[in-house]
Structures are given as C-alpha cells and as structure tokens.
Amino acid sequence: MALPEVRLRFPARWLAFGWAGLCAVISVRSASAQGTFSTILTNGPTAKRLNLVLLAEGYTAAQQATFRADATNVVNNLLNVPPYQSYRRYFNAFAIFVPSNQTGSDHPSQSYYRDTYFNSTYESYGVSDLVTIPPNDRDSDYSHGQGRVDALLQAQMPQYDLAILVVNDLSYGGSGGQIIVTSKSSASSKIVIHESGHTLAKLGDEYSDSFPAFSGPEEPNTTQETRRDFIKWKAWIAPATPLPTPAASAYASAVGLFEGAHYQATNWYRPKLDCMMRTVGVPFCEVCSEALVKSIYQHVRPVESYSPGVTNLAITNRQTLTFGLTPLQPNDHPLTVRWLTNGVTVGGATGASLNLYPLALSNGIHQVRAMVQDDTVLVRNDPSGLLGQTVNWVVQVNLAPAWAKLAPPLRLRDGRFQVSLTGQAPGGFLLQGSTNLATWTTLASNVLSSGTFEFIDPATNYRGRSYRAVLPP
C-alpha cells in the first residue's frame, strides 16, 4: 500500500515561521532540563563523524527504554537505505531523553491534548499529518519547543549534524525544518529519509503541485535550465535521452529532464521520473544520491589518521622511515590509495603504508604524498574534490658522508682474528669477511655510527681471511 504523501508536500523551511494560536495544554516546565544522554551508534570521534542526535517527545519517565528502542529503529531505518548504507561507518548516533508528563502528541481535531516536553502537535497549518513544535500556528513561543531542543543540543551535543525528534505516537506524521520531527509509526521512517535529503544535501522537493508564495533558488536536484551542456546533472544524462524527457514508462529508469518540480508544474525540472524527493518510499535517484554522498564528505574526511603526525621531517640517518595512514573505508567498497615521492607515483604502492629508504634519496628536500580517493559509482561530478584527500610530508635529508678505515687484522693466540674499524656512517656498516675475495659473508650488521668498533671473528679454522666494511642496502 502506498504511503501517504500529503505531509511531505509542505516546504520544510516554512515551518520556521509560526503565528499566535491556542493549544489546550502547554508544558511550561523549565527549558533548562539536562536530559539523559546515551549512545546508540559509535564509529569514531565526534569531530570525525557525522553525528545524529535523537530526542524524546511524549515519552514518560517509565518509557525511557521504549524511547531508546524507537530511536534505534529510526537510526537503522535511515542508515539501511542507499546511499547511507554504504557510509554507515561515517555516522555516530546519540539519544537525549527528557520525560514528558503524558504520552503521545496533540490531535486538536479530536480535542486530544497531551502534556509533553516539546509541546508537539499534529494538524499543523491545517495538514493532518504535519507534526511540529513551537513556534508554529498554534503556539508562537520559541521557548516552548524549538528553544528547548536547541538548549539540550547545546548542552549535550553541540557537535550534532542532524537532530531528530521522535514523537511517541503511532499516527503517521512528521515534518522538517531546523530539526526533523517523526512519529514512531513505521511508515513515518520514510519522512526521516526524505527530510534528511533537505537537511544534509540541501535537496529540493520535486513536487509539481503549486504551493502559494513558494519561491527560492535552484537546488541540486531542481533546475530551470534546459540546455544539455548547462544542466548541472549532465554527467548522468545519456546522449540519446531527449530533453525535456517525456514522463513515460520508457524513461522510468533514465536520468533526464522531467518537467514538474520545486512546487511548479511547468518550467521547473527534476532529474528522474520518480525519486524519494517526490514520492515517499521510492529510492533516492542518482542525482540525489550523488548530492548526499558529497554532503557526507563535507562532514567526514576519508583519511582517519596518518603518521608521522608531523609533516615536516628531518632525516640525519639511514634508518628506514615508514609513512602510514588509516583510510575510513565505506561498508561496501574500498578507498583507493596512491603514494608519490617527488611527484612520481611509486609503483605497486597502493596499501596503507610506504617505506622510505634515505639512501635512495640525495641530500636535500623531498616530498612524500599519499592520495586517498573514493571512486564510488554513486558520484560522477565532484569538482571540489570532496571524495579525495591528500596528505603531504616534506622530508629534509641531510646525511653526513660515510667513511671507514680498517686496520690490518690481528691474529690472536687462539687462532681467531681481531678487526678494528674506525669511521662514520649514520646508518652503520656491515662488516663482512671472505676467504677468496669473491664470496662475502656478513659477520656484523648496523655497527658503528661513528668512532671505533672492535670485532673478534669467532672462526678459528682460517689460515687467512679478508675483511671489509660496506654500507647497508
């Protein structure tokens, strides 16, 4: 059965404007309540994740566990749909519980009023399933609704990116605006998905029905442009697709230019015949999915961490230096990694680390670069490079010249040879021995960065033996 769509055909940004009205029950408790804070989903530090916060409305003190279960369902319903499901690891989710005196929400036409903390109500602005909190057409006082939300968010999770108010009412309904409001009805989960498109990616409604006095600029998924080369989603349009595109089943799966969007039946266009931003329950189209993925990367970067954490380095010895990073991998595909030294790609280096050998570099300044990219098929147009991140290190190599002097070997009374090595090599020497000057065996490694090194060869069965000091490879 098709889900109701009437609620969603109300421009979200209009909800910021309310006017004075009467509501039978208004909660006038202090807006300074701290609430109970808990974690639903954690994938990383809040500074490096997109943070969802869910708040309880119409749940009594005895229903805290019920709210947590309902809030978890809201999170799962959102993050289990494309494109969010690919980037679930990029999200955290938290809950703030403040008890209400009564369960549910107001239904004014039924003379049903509840004493709840955020004073939510159905039937806002004459729309039966439009659920809002003040300021609205029934109560213009910001402090009775949105002000309480803002105070809790500021106190408990100022790093939030998306706030969702979960209303303990089984009737279908919700709204968008500064926050998303949704009832606990399973059908209402689609409202959260739709409204997240507005909040995160600034997507527009694709409805054709007129809404009085609605205006505004183009959104990522709406346009008045009809010239193929200037359409913002032209990368998704096949050359054979006619523009404007007929609203016919033959083009149901095509990205094109379909007339009717932005609350206008004519002269405004959308990318696809149908989409979540037009019909509840339909998946996001390619253009909207692309905008959502890019919006995720506006909040979360693809490199979780890197080392060395200092990006200006000085090397004065020949020890191997390891560079590494931790890519934030999506759930269903890997990020690609490239390493470059002095602008040249290192062949075969596609993993999370790179070993740098100072001996392979001349003294002076060198650059090491790691480039991480999400090559998802969901994005074709990324002019700002949101899906990639580059980490640069500047390496100053300053190795002192190596020199060595071997004293003639001294045969000891027990038949062994003693070797004295004097010299300097920041990475040390390999001391090698041979009986034929063709085959050399390493006797000691990483010896003598500077000064004198004394070595006694344990072998006693050689009548003669040659020794040499070489730099390690």
Which residues make up each language-model segment?
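Boundary at the C-terminal end of the N-terminal hydrophobic targeting segment
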Residues: 28-33
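Propeptide-to-catalytic entry region of secreted or membrane-anchored zinc metalloproteases
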Residues: 34-152, 183
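Short pre-active-site segment immediately N-terminal to the catalytic Zn-binding motif
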Residues: 64-67, 173-193
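Active-site recognition of the HExxH zinc-binding catalytic motif
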Residues: 189-206
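Solvent-exposed segments in extracellular or luminal domains encompassing
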Residues: 352-365, 454-458
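Exposed beta-strand face motif in extracellular beta-rich ectodomains
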Residues: 364-369, 463-467
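Short, composition-biased motifs enriched in small/polar/acidic residues
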Residues: 398-473
